[in-house]
A protein has these predicted regions:
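Non-transmembrane, aqueous-exposed alpha-helical and coiled segments at domain scale
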Residues: 1-375
Length: 375
């Protein structure tokens, strides 16, 4: 008699939950590819818009296709007045990820995906609208300013920085943001992406799938590591102080965010890319203290625990050097990862079976209901 082999692993670690053509993570311990392209190659030689097109279509665009795609995205940047009115009602103290979740859901009420033939339109609409959703709420709730949600910036990264700061970004800042969006765009079956695929497997609409993914990313065990890293780094006065205080954190068994990874075993290939940009921005700003402290943290964690930095750690100093408020770090992740989420929704729909796993019951043995007086 054959016995069914049961896979083990908390949180489904090490278990395959499906097939994808979109991304490989952790092959040989540290690899990352989007549709066959290495992440370092994409970060060096492409733009975020090209990567979004790649994930949605399976191939990089030629010049004509890219120009058409960017023009389509450009035309979708503004927000409906009804959505602006809702964003103005959201208090300053609200978690920014709740703002992104509400903005996504409400936009789906105003501009629904009526059938799956509109999936690319819905995905591109969210891609274009997310920077404005984030910045319109932030500028109004924190500064009382109703911003223009459009800009003449050519890239989505530049557009975001323009909305946030009220002026055109430098060429270097625009490129750094572009690279950051590329690095965060897709990462296989992480928790939020799998949430989107589960939702898609029920044949739900794009806005519902993305709203669910945002809610999942809101959890501190998935999103927010770059924010937590920034909060920690800001408490250190020097590299030596960082190492001393981190030793105390380890002794107290406190969790230190921004290190290690669930899939990568040797290194996170995104780290070396964003770390180099952090160093460039430090030199540009004429203040390398934040970068030097970050390097000290990296050295300490490797020497002490053999834990490497993941993509989030040096993103903290990178965003800080560009003047981005810490509370917006994870919403930026949403602006980027939307491409991966939407691509996975589209892929799930192409060969769909509802995702419905089983569970191993570990509860009480069968029993009878006793009269209430005898319980």
């Amino acid at each position: 008699m054959m016995t069914e082999k049961k896979l083990s692993g908390a949180g489904l670690r090490g278990q395959s939950a499906g097939e994808t053509t979109l991304c490989t993570v952790g092959k040989s311990g540290s690899g990352l590819t989007y549709c066959g392209y290495d992440i370092a190659d994409l970060a060096e030689n492409s733009t975020f818009e090209e990567v979004a097109y790649l994930l949605f279509n399976g191939e990089l665009p030629n010049e004509k296709a890219l120009a058409t795609y960017k023009a389509d995205l450009f035309a979708m940047r503004d927000l409906p007045q009804a959505l602006k009115a809702v964003l103005k009602l959201i208090p300053k103290e609200t978690h920014p990820m709740d703002v992104m979740r509400t903005g996504c859901s409400f936009l789906g009420n105003l501009e629904p995906e009526n059938d799956f033939s509109e999936q690319n339109k819905a995905a591109n609409r969210l891609l274009s609208a997310f920077p404005a959703i984030m910045c319109y709420w932030y500028k109004f709730s924190h500064e009382g300013i109703e911003i223009d949600c459009t800009s003449e910036e050519a890239s989505l990264g530049g557009h975001f920085l323009r909305l946030l700061n009220g002026k055109s970004p430098s060429a270097q800042h625009e490129r750094v943001m572009d690279v950051s969006l590329i690095l965060y765009a897709e990462h296989e079956f992480n928790a939020s992406t799998f949430t989107a695929r589960v939702c898609a497997s029920t044949l739900s609409d794009m806005f519902s799938c993305v709203t669910g993914a945002i809610g999942t990313l809101r959890g501190p065990l998935h999103g927010g590591a770059n924010e937590a890293a920034m909060d920690m780094i800001e408490t250190f006065s020097s590299p030596a102080d960082a190492k001393e205080k981190m030793a105390g954190m380890l002794a107290r068994k406190e969790k230190i965010m921004g290190f290690g990874h669930a899939v990568y075993s040797t290194s996170d290939p995104r780290n070396i890319i964003i770390k180099a940009w952090s160093e460039k921005l430090a030199a540009e700003n004429g203040d390398t203290s934040l970068y030097n402290i970050s390097v000290a943290c990296e050295e300490f964690m490797w020497d002490s625990k053999k834990l490497f930095c993941n993509a989030d750690f040096f993103h903290a100093s990178t965003y800080n050097y560009m003047g981005i408020p810490t509370k917006l770090f994870t919403p930026i992740f949403v602006c980027s990862r939307l491409t991966g989420w939407a691509a996975h929704v589209m892929e799930q729909r192409t060969n769909n079976r509802i995702i419905r796993p089983s569970a191993d019951y570990i509860g009480a043995e069968p029993r009878k209901v006793q009269p209430i007086a005898h319980r």
